[in-house]
Regions:
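Bacterial Sec-dependent N-terminal signal peptides
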Residues: 1-24
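Surface-exposed, polar helix/loop patches in the mature regions of secreted/periplasmic/lumenal proteins
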Residues: 81-134
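Flexible, processing/modification-adjacent segments and terminal tails
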Residues: 22-34, 131-134
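Mature extracytoplasmic domains of secretory-pathway proteins
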Residues: 49-96
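Short secondary-structure junctions and interdomain/linker hinges
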Residues: 15, 34-35, 80, 84
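N-terminal targeting signals for Sec/Tat export/insertion, comprising classic cleavable signal peptides
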Residues: 29-59
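Generic structural signal for short, solvent-exposed loop/turn connectors between secondary structure elements
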Residues: 21, 67, 79, 105-106
Length: 134
């Protein structure tokens, strides 16, 4: 019975972790129409020079004059809120800013909107960088 209970607990934890930030990622990884006015998407990957393994991945999306996309991201962030380990949100008028943090691997997602202007930054840190200044 104990083995079954441990298995179920691990299964629930794994499912919860796999569902973290799924709505945000669906928007970032989906086919956002490239012909939307003022949409820019950039991505960068930092690798360990010795092993070639990914240390950090950053995706940045910016858009201007796109209220519908801003609303989609606000909704996605709010849907993923219950899976975040940390959440900082500021809202007032046409401004909405939120930073959400998930662990294992560490993910820091930031959304900043001001009316129809939007910026989303998604950072995934797979492992901390070694400090070579010793």
């Amino acid at each position: 019975m104990k083995k079954l209970l441990v298995f179920v607990m691990l299964l629930v934890a794994t499912i919860a972790e796999s569902q973290a930030q799924e709505h945000i990622d669906a928007l970032l990884n989906g086919d956002i129409e490239s012909n939307r006015y003022g949409l820019t998407m950039r991505s960068a990957v930092k690798r360990d020079p010795a092993t070639g393994k990914i240390i950090k991945r950053v995706v940045e999306l910016t858009a201007s004059d796109d209220k519908s996309l801003a609303k989609e991201f606000i909704a996605a962030f709010k849907l993923d809120r219950n899976t975040a380990e940390a959440w900082d949100e500021n809202e007032g008028g046409t401004i909405y800013n939120v930073t959400a943090v998930w662990l294992n691997p560490k993910r820091v997602y930031t959304l900043a909107t001001n009316g129809s202007m939007i910026t989303v930054i998604a950072q995934t840190i797979y492992r901390e960088e070694k400090n070579n200044n010793n």
